[in-house]
Amino acid sequence: MRLENFEIAKSINFIFCSHPLNKKNVDENYLEEYQAAGLNHTCALFSFEDLENGKLSLYGEDIKGVTIYRGWMMPPHMYENFYNLLLEKGIQLINSPKEYAKYHLLPGWYSDFEGLTPFSVWNESRDIGDALELTEGLEGAFVVKDYVKSRKHEWYDACFIKDISDREETFRVINNFLNRQGENLEGGVVLRKFESLKSIG
């Protein structure tokens, strides 16, 4: 890297989630990344929990200018509020709210990666009947999720559909998914073709 490019890169800040019980420390899940970024960049902290309530609480080093966020996923409306609150303090996140929403929600980014990502269909509904309509004409194994998350930790109960033409099993898995996501369901239902990947490591 040329020296001038290195200096420009060094001017970029980072902002991380703070620990929920000790807001002056970084969330332990991001400790190694925080320490690595701190070698060449100014790093601030903020309380994710306070932001969920609409309040911006900053800790750590003072930052201004272009900043990269590293932390937990946020719903687009929460990210937009975060972006605007930081901007009022002279801190500009590198991704605008529009860019964040586009690549956070599957319908926004899918066309950019079609052919490189598993085939997917989706709707904007929370209704089991509407979800079952998505299965028409589909064959093989699929994964059910919303626009952001699946319930992969409940693989056989609320995520993986071995044969989507099996109406009873498909209903069971999708219905479990909808009921368990509840109010946390983001957008609507997504069905993604299951790809059996090679295991490494």
Each predicted region: which residue ranges?
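ATP-binding N-terminal substructure of ATP-dependent carboxylate-amine bond-forming enzymes
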Residues: 1-92
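Active-site nucleotide/adenylate-binding loops and adjacent lid/helix of ATP-dependent enzymes
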Residues: 2, 11-18, 84-200
